[in-house]
């Protein structure tokens, strides 16, 4: 039985046709994918033909030129605004701005696009975009380089960046040429400067400006793609601090202070001296003045070959001639002498400076002590008179004793016995109320004689009298009852002027004749019965008159020059017979003490 073609529908049902042939959305959902594609395309084609066929109205073309000029004007205003704000963006920013447009603007732009053909719009806009992009790209690259350099200088690694740039330009580290000064207030006469980003005009002009302030100027400038750097070696006429030099050079070279590196030069490094010497030979280097001594000394062939060895005896002789017996004083002063003394320079080059200083101080103390002990009291006083400088008058001492109602002849007679160390006359005590000038008088006399001051606060130590072994006179200032009791108990023979045994630390006890002793006190030892055994050993002078004015200052001052005039004036009255004067009159010549090895061919 053959199959019938067409649709089978029941004629009894009047609406069966609609149920069979009508298209419904539910039917599309049940269809397979792609089943109705051809049908939809075909239907669209017929619809478009029908639409074009039915729409015969004329299209309004509009004013193309006016719209184009409006768009160009708007684009020009946007470019001008971007230039004024200095925010010329890259192509990425421009693409981002296009992507951020609102849907309304896109629809509006799509409507206007109908006025132009697609190819015509591309032909007009493409050349402008290419030319503007190339110019903006070149400008942005230069601006990026400048911005990157500025950021590096301002960053926390600015010092690392500047040191790296200096080393890449000069093939030498900045720290190899300089030594470190941590404090900006520390002054120095010579400075090394590294200036970054300096202009050629200011670099050349700085030489003429620095000639007035520097005795030596050496400057050189180098450049490469990473930046520009100039190095200066300046020897100022006066010492300047880093802060002063920074302000001076920043204003002179018209650069930021962050673009400067400043440190004093390394004057003891051979590599640093060779760097400056080699740079001075370059035609690109600008110079003014002669090379510093430390560069010539290290680069001259004669000086480099004739390096002297350190002579310890020469150092001891120098310290003895200057009467330096303290270790710190010797070390400091001998280091300062290195600029003019070759042996001092050799001393600084040794690895045993502390040992040499300690041994030198020990030897000088031995020599000075032996020299002092070998002199008689008149010869010793004459030596002290030679050390006193200035003009003085013995009348100031006379006026002071007259003010205290003490006859000067009485003091002269007591001082004569005191200087000669006569037993029972070896101690002078100045008694009186406070502020009467007792300490002023005794301290000035002890200072002139170069004596020793004893502090009773250290009496519990076995070594508080150790300084008497090297002293020609001693002073105990402001003795109290405890001090007088100690004298009465332990130091009667010292007050008498007889030999005593002195205990010295880490050394054997030494026996010496007790030196003359001065004592100041507010206690009248002659009126105290408890110190009966000291009455015959101490000769007292009473000071009753106060020595202060209304403002609390002392109107009397006695200096070393006054004591020098006093001893010269009363030399005969004090029985100071100098045996050395008699020997000089007999024709004996005095020779300076020598404690260093001299040339054996020299004439003695």
UniProtKB/Swiss-Prot annotation:
Protein residues bound to ATP: 432-439
Protein name per the record: Replication protein E1
Summary of subunit composition and partner proteins: Can form hexamers. Interacts with E2 protein; this interaction increases E1 DNA binding specificity. Interacts with host DNA polymerase subunit POLA2. Interacts with host single stranded DNA-binding protein RPA1. Interacts with host TOP1; this interaction stimulates the enzymatic activity of TOP1.
Record-level GO cellular component terms: host cell nucleus
GO biological process, one term: DNA replication
Post-translational modification, as annotated: Phosphorylated. Sumoylated.
Annotated spans, Disordered: 24-48, 90-112, 581-604
Modified residues (Phosphoserine): 90, 94
Region described as DNA-binding region: spans on this chain: 141-307
Polar residues bias locations: 591-604
């Amino acid at each position: 039985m053959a199959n019938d073609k067409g649709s089978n529908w029941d004629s009894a049902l009047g609406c069966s046709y609609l149920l069979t042939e009508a298209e419904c959305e539910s039917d599309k959902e049940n269809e397979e994918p792609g089943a109705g594609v051809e049908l939809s395309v075909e239907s669209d084609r017929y619809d478009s033909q029908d639409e074009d066929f039915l729409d015969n109205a004329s299209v309004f073309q509009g004013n193309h030129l006016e719209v184009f000029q409006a768009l160009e004007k708007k684009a020009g205003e946007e470019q001008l605004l971007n230039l004024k704000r200095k925010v010329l963006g890259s192509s990425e920013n421009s693409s981002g701005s296009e992507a951020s447009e609102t849907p309304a603007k896109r629809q509006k732009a799509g409507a206007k696009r109908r006025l132009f053909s697609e190819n015509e719009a591309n032909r007009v806009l493409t050349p402008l975009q290419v030319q503007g992009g190339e110019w903006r790209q070149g400008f942005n690259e230069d601006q990026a380089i400048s911005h990157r350099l500025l950021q590096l200088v301002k960053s926390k690694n600015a010092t690392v960046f500047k040191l790296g740039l200096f080393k890449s330009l000069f093939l030498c580290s900045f720290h190899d040429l300089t030594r470190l000064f941590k404090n900006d207030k520390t002054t120095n006469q010579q400075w090394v400067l590294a200036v970054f980003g300096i202009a050629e005009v200011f670099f050349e002009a700085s030489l003429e400006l620095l000639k007035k302030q520097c005795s030596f100027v050496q400057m050189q400038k180098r450049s490469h793609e990473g930046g520009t750097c100039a190095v200066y070696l300046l020897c100022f006429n006066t010492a300047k601090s880093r802060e002063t030099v920074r302000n001076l050079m920043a204003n002179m070279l018209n650069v930021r202070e962050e673009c400067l590196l400043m440190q004093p030069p390394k004057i003891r490094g051979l590599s640093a001296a060779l760097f400056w010497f080699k740079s001075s030979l370059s035609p690109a280097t600008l110079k003014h003045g002669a090379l510093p001594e430390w560069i010539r000394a290290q680069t001259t062939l004669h000086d480099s070959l004739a390096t002297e060895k350190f002579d310890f005896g020469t150092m001891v002789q120098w310290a003895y001639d200057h009467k330096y017996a303290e270790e710190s004083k010797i070390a400091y002063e001998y280091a300062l002498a290195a600029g003019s003394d070759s042996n001092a320079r050799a001393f600084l080059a040794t690895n045993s400076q502390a040992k040499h200083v300690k041994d030198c101080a020990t030897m000088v103390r031995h020599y000075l002590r032996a020299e002092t002990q070998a002199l008689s009291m008149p010869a010793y006083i004459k030596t002290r008179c030679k050390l006193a400088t200035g003009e003085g008058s013995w009348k100031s001492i006379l006026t002071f004793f007259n003010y205290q109602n003490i006859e000067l002849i009485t003091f002269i007679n007591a001082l004569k016995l005191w200087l000669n160390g006569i037993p029972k006359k070896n101690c002078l005590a100045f008694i009186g109320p406070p502020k009467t000038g007792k300490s002023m008088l005794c301290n000035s006399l002890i200072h002139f004689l170069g004596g020793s001051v004893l502090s009773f606060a250290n009496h519990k130590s076995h070594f508080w009298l150790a300084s008497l072994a090297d002293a020609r006179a001693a002073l105990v200032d402001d003795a109290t009852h405890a001090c007088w009791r100690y004298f009465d108990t332990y130091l009667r023979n010292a007050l008498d002027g007889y030999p005593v045994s002195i205990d010295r630390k880490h050394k054997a006890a030494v026996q010496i004749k007790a030196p003359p002793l001065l004592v100041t006190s507010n206690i009248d030892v002659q009126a105290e019965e408890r110190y009966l055994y000291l009455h015959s050993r101490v000769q007292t002078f009473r000071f009753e008159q106060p020595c202060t004015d209304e403002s609390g200052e002392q109107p009397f001052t006695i200096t070393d020059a006054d004591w020098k005039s006093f001893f010269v004036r009363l030399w005969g009255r004090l029985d100071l017979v100098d045996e050395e004067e008699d020997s000089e009159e007999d024709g004996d010549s005095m020779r300076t003490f020598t404690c260093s090895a001299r040339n054996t061919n020299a004439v003695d």
